[in-house]
Structure formats: structure tokens, C-alpha cells
Amino acid sequence: MSAATLEQGLAELGLHLSPATQARLAAFATLLQKWNRVYNLTSIRDAGQVVTHHLLDSLAVLPHLEGITTLADVGSGGGLPGIPLALAAPDCHPALAVTSIETVNKKASFQQQAKIELGLANFTVVNERVENVRPEAKFDAVISRAFSELLDFVGLTAHLLRPGGRFLAMKGVYPRDEIARLPAGFRVVEVHPLTVPGLGAERHLIILERN
């Protein structure tokens, strides 16, 4: 993995992360590639693309997490975006704690190992189907890159949120048709086009709330 690519990408995103944090992000990328050879955590195997498509894509949402202290990452697979966000949090959002909810055992096992190896005190792994999770304290927000349909995202995760909590959907092209299919009781409150360095594709962060 190119540390220079990561450093340049962070600068283009306007993120000022310490050298120690950048080193931990690089260590996570190495760990992801190592486990991916056996566990098939991601289809992306090129080291440079791991930086752009996974690390920088995940971190592009950081400026939009103001006011959020508890964040649930649903269906994060290899820990994306949850682990990069947890790694960067001490430099940008010191109060942020991330909980990853992952159904697949091998993916949850990888995330737990990453937590241990990277010393992530602000990251928790829950190996369970999202609909079965009943948190003691509900979350400020829930985020996901995994859902192909906003309808499913809000339907399966609404019970995780505190009153006034937000859904953060990381999408590619603007999901006009998906928004039109949202059930009554949910609305889009913010749309943020994201420019991810090195990723030649549209990205949007769609923020939703209950009415």
C-alpha cells in the first residue's frame, strides 16, 4: 500500500490525520489484504484500490459526523466504513464510538481481530443479524455502504436509532428511484455529493430521518 497515496488523498479530502493515525490506517489496509486471501472479504485486491475504494471512500463521510457520538455500521463486511472511521476519530471526532453489526461469522471474526491488532478501544463488533440486535442504548446514527435499497436500509435499522437519530446511506449515483420508494414516515434531510480522490465514480451520502 502506498503511504503517499493515502497522505495525498487525505489532504484532498481536507482531513488532517496524525502520522500515527495514517500508519494505523495503512496497517488496517495490510490486514484487510492479508485476510482477504482466505476469507474473501472484498473483491478489491489491488493495494492502490484498497486505499481509494475503501479507506478514502470510507473517510469521505467524516466531515458529516458532527454531533454523532454513537454510530452503528450495518453490514460492513471487512469493517467498512466503520474501522477507518474509528481509526480516524481520535483526530477528528474524539467522542465517536463505532459499533459494527455483521451477520457473517468470518467477517465479524476479521473485524474482531483488527480491533485487537489495531488497539481500537472505540470499536465494537456484534456478530448478529441486524433485526435481532436490541442495543441497551440506541444510536445517534446508523451508517452503511452495504444496502442496495434505501427501503431495506431504513426498514431493517430503524429500531437501532434513538428519537431524532439519523440514517447515513453511502451510495453511488444519486438514488432518485430509491428515494421515491421510501415508506411513509421517512424523509431525506440532506444530500452530500462526495468526491473521493482516485475514485472515478459518483458518490453520495444520503441522510434520512423519521418524520
From Swiss-Prot:
Subcellular location: Cytoplasm
Stretches that traverse the bilayer: none
Binding site for S-adenosyl-L-methionine: G75, L80, V130, E131, R145
GO cellular component: cytosol
EC number(s) on file: 2.1.1.170
Catalysis performed (reactions): guanosine(527) in 16S rRNA + S-adenosyl-L-methionine = N(7)-methylguanosine(527) in 16S rRNA + S-adenosyl-L-homocysteine
One Gene Ontology molecular-function label: rRNA (guanine-N7-)-methyltransferase activity
Family, as annotated: Belongs to the methyltransferase superfamily. RNA methyltransferase RsmG family.
Function field: Specifically methylates the N7 position of guanine in position 527 of 16S rRNA.
Protein name: Ribosomal RNA small subunit methyltransferase G
Organism: Aromatoleum aromaticum (strain DSM 19018 / LMG 30748 / EbN1)
Originating gene: rsmG
